[in-house]
Amino acid sequence: MFLSGRDLVLLGVVKGHSNGAIQPAGVDLSVGEIESLADAGFLGEEDKIMPKGDRIQCEYGVCELEPGAYRLRFNEVVSIPPGHVGFCFPRSSLLRMGCYLGCAVWDPGYTGRGQAMLLVANPHGLRLEMGSRIAQLVVARVEGPLTSLYKGDYQGEGL
C-alpha cells in the first residue's frame, strides 16, 4: 500500500516542499543543487569512491545543461518512517523533454536531502530552473517484521 501525498506531508516524511508539490500518490521533489561529474568514480566489493563534482552556475536561476550526466540534490528533507520504503521517479514532463532521473531506493529510517542522477539525453540539452519540481517521491509500507533501520553512509546527507 502506498501513502497519499497528503499523508506524507502530515506524517513529516517530506519537509520543505514547494506549493503544488502534493500529488495524489506522492510528493514532488525540487532541484536544490546541480553538479557535473568531474572525474571517474569507483565501486568495489568493499569500497566506493564518489566522483568529485563541479557546481553548475546558473544565470538568473536557470541552468543551461548540455547532454550528459549530472548529480543533483533535492531541496526537500525526506525522512522514511520505520516500516516503509521510498521510491523516486522522474516527472513525466522531464521524460518528454528527453531527460531521465535515476534515484536509489530509500530504506526505512533514512533521513536527508537525497541525491539523484540526471541524464540529459536530448541532443539539444535542457534549460532547468533551480527549484523546479523534477521528481515524485512515493512511499510504500514494507510487509513483514522490520529487522533494522538504515544506517548507511548517506544517513543525514545534505543536512
Curated annotation (Swiss-Prot):
Lineage of the organism: Archaea, Thermoproteota, Thermoprotei, Desulfurococcales, Desulfurococcaceae
EC number: 3.6.1.23
Catalytic activity: dUTP + H2O = dUMP + diphosphate + H(+)
GO biological process entries: dUMP biosynthetic process; dUTP biosynthetic process
HAMAP family per record: dUTPase_arch (MF_00635)
Top-level class of the enzyme under EC nomenclature: hydrolase
Gene name of the record: dut
Alphabetized UniProt keyword annotations: Hydrolase, Nucleotide metabolism
GO molecular function (one): dUTP diphosphatase activity
Pathway: Pyrimidine metabolism; dUMP biosynthesis; dUMP from dCTP (dUTP route): step 2/2
Family, similarity comment: Belongs to the dCTP deaminase family. Archaeal dUTPase subfamily.
The protein's name: Probable deoxyuridine 5'-triphosphate nucleotidohydrolase
